[in-house]
Amino acid sequence: MRKFLSLAVMCSLALPAMAFAQPESPKVAADDLEDMPEVEVETTTTEKSVTVEEETTTLVVEGEDGAPDTMVTVVEEKTTVVEEVEETHPFLDGLTWMVMASAFYRIDGYVGEGVRAGEYNTLGYPYTQYNGFGLNFVGGMAQYTGEKFGVTIDLRWGTGASLLTPLVPVKQGYVTYMPNDNISIDFGFFDTIFGGEVADEWANANYTRGALYFLRQPFNHMGIRSAFAFNDKAGFTLMVTNGGVLGGSPIDNNETPTIGWQFALTGEIEAVGFYFGGQHGAGGDNDNKNWENFFDWVLTANAGIFTLVANGDYQISPNGGNNVDGNTDRPFSYGHSLQLIFDASDKFSIGLRGEHLSGNENFRNYVSSGDTGLATATITLRYKPVEYLVLSLEGRGEWNTREIYFARNGPTAMDPDTMEEILLPSQKKNYSAILGFTAFIGN
């Protein structure tokens, strides 16, 4: 969630406060527990076994006044009870943890122009945004859930960390209050509830995240998130956060907070889920009006070995000041994605994804930084040789209406600030191959 198993609520309407996510996987090592305050150890005694033994003793009683001696047999029972003492640690029962690492090798190029090192596009996405070897993320998560409260710490380092969070290495950090079983309230910095993909790629259809994920959706939010479970099939989440509709603002940059919300519905057997929500906030820095509006929907469906995830996003921005041609339409952008996962076996799976992003004329001409008409197609073959290890082979194609991709022998220009020669984008399409290596483990 971030995303797909926003699926925090996605699969079971588990409260997003203590879900995850993402997927969330594994959790903390013994070293992390050494500095924790000493907690009282509870002990319970259980009866393991009972053994009964009989001992027979023969006694001779001398007769009186010439009477004969009498033989007396005495039977004595001995009962032995073997007990087992079990120690329990109630504090540790509420602790979950995860550690992970994700590395890759990426290559693309153009016939006659070779492979260019470094970033391959001008939009700054995805996490695998350059050719060669890379380490997207390495990090982990620790979460403690008590009877009425919880605390979550989620950290990430790596070349992709700065794209994921403005608080590197903090991916998430929040406290949770749970007044009852149906309500949870989070305070702090947390993953978004929107979208059909999450930051942890093993929970997605593909190794790379899509253009919709990067260009049309928030990653995280700073503020308050409240989740309400109406029943086991319907829930509602409400957020009040910093920044604009795309989130990610540790320090507020306008005068009014942003309001976010999401309804979550699941089917009778949870094979189908539908999630619809939005964000509404001031459109500029130090602003309290000109509100932007963002809407997101996700549909999930599962049929045995097949899983389908469809996602759509729409953003209406305040009217820009650059529409010199007299076009007064408010900039409107949109994007859609469709993912299909085929689990051939416990070890092999295939993931497919198709996307299209664009907007109205005012968005394409005055707001967009290059995603004026962007389509992507991705296929991922996955193999899990052992538990918690995922190997991915991925092919990805991208097509744009403008030249946003670099070629090694492309045109150059002089940077007026540094007076250095810089490479200019010269291609409208890009094809790449990616090898992904991911390991994650926890409780």
Q: Where are the language model's segments positioned?
A:
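Outer-membrane beta-barrel "beta-signal"
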Residues: 383-385, 390, 425-443
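Transmembrane beta-barrel strands of outer-membrane/channel proteins
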Residues: 99-107, 153-157, 187-189, 238-242, ...
